[in-house]
Design a protein with these regions (language model features):
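Membrane-interface junctions at transmembrane-helix termini in multi-pass inner-membrane proteins
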Residues: 1, 18, 195-229, 240, ...
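Hydrophobic alpha-helical transmembrane segments
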Residues: 1-45, 229-233, 247-268
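Transmembrane alpha-helical segments of multi-pass transport proteins
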Residues: 4, 8, 12, 230-233, ...
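Alpha-helical transmembrane segments of multi-pass membrane transport and lipid-handling proteins
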Residues: 7, 116-117, 139-203, 235-239, ...
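Helix-terminus/linker motif at the lipid-water interface of multi-pass membrane proteins
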Residues: 12, 16-17, 74-112, 127-130, ...
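Interhelical loop/hinge segments that connect adjacent transmembrane helices in multipass membrane
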Residues: 13-25, 39-80, 127, 132-137, ...
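Alpha-helical transmembrane segments of polytopic membrane transporters and translocases
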Residues: 68, 84-85, 99-117, 147-151, ...
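Helix-loop junctions and terminal segments of transmembrane helices
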Residues: 110-146, 211-216
Length: 302
């Protein structure tokens, strides 16, 4: 999809002014079809043939075992992506679209960073599962993955916080018939929301560590309860914050929900696996964050 969209945007064959959401939909559909064809080719190359048969008892068993995972994904999707919808539904019509757009501009960077953390969790799942199955010690793997995730996400978050205004100006230009005052106000609001969402980014990235650990251990009941609590907190705070703070209220809600679910999952994993990260680990993380903030601040002011 990246290659197709890049070709459409920068090849010079197609005018950029003609690019619209339909082109993106067509590009995404084409990329899925190409991926499917490649996947089928690889399977056929290794198996020689592909026969499709339906074994209904087996299918029902798979569905039954998959339901807790499906419910978890559904609940997490609710409290991760409800904000733009609620902004449009809760705020008056004359400002809802504008505020949803302001939130979406900052959310795109949050979502991009979130994909990096998600890929990290995909790698960790089989590692955690293998260690748990063998009955080996998890302390080292959890500590290393947790430290690596915190280091990576803190760097991204702090850089985005300090340079939020610059990033918004780089990504979004002034629109036709828009005054410079309106543009600056829109960019400032989006940059302030980005700062808050970067706190959510760190929290959700930590969730990918301990949520993945609990998933590998089969603790789906606890994870679904945590996700359900997250949905309740999300809805409650959004209905309180959005009417008062508008798009910024949605970002504040996201921060609260992600931090709450992150903390709960951490303590559940700590209790189940008897995790002991040690005071030296937390001191090293805190020292790194202080050094990173100081360095970024000096670079920003120079």
């Amino acid at each position: 999809m990246i290659l197709i969209c890049s070709f459409l945007l920068w090849s010079g064959i197609f005018p950029k002014s003609d690019f619209n959401i339909y082109w993106f939909v067509y590009s995404q559909t084409a990329s899925y079809v190409i991926t499917l064809i490649i996947a089928i080719y690889i399977v056929l190359k290794h198996t020689g043939k592909l026969t499709i048969k339906f074994n209904f008892p087996f299918v029902l068993m798979i569905i039954k075992k998959s339901l807790p995972y499906a419910l978890l994904v559904l609940l997490m999707s609710f409290y991760n992506r409800l904000e733009p919808v609620l902004i449009e539904r809760i705020l008056p019509k004359d400002i809802s679209a504008v505020q949803a757009g302001i939130y979406a501009r900052a959310y795109r960077l949050f979502d991009a960073g979130n994909n990096i953390s998600y890929l990290f969790s995909v790698i960790l799942l089989p590692l955690f599962a293998a260690v748990i199955k063998k009955g080996e010690d998890l302390q080292t793997l959890v500590k290393q993955s947790f430290g690596l995730m915190l280091t990576m996400t803190c760097i991204i978050a702090i850089v985005c916080i300090f340079y939020s205004q610059n990033l918004m100006e780089l990504l979004y230009t002034i629109q036709d018939n828009e005054s410079i005052e309106t543009y600056n106000l829109r960019i400032t609001e989006s940059s302030n929301i980005l700062k808050i969402l970067m706190g959510s980014f760190v929290s959700i990235s930590v969730t990918y560590i301990f949520g993945t650990l609990l998933t590998a251990n089969g603790n789906l009941k606890q994870l679904n309860i945590v996700a359900a609590v997250g949905v309740v907190i999300n809805l409650t705070l959004n209905f309180i914050f959005i009417p008062v703070f508008e798009a910024k209220g949605a970002a504040m809600t996201s921060l609260c929900v992600q931090f709450a679910t992150c903390a709960i999952q951490f303590f559940i994993a700590k209790r189940i696996f008897n995790l002991k990260l040690g005071i030296s680990f937390w001191i090293s993380i805190l020292s790194f964050i202080i050094l990173l903030v100081t360095t970024t601040s000096l670079l920003k002011s120079s």
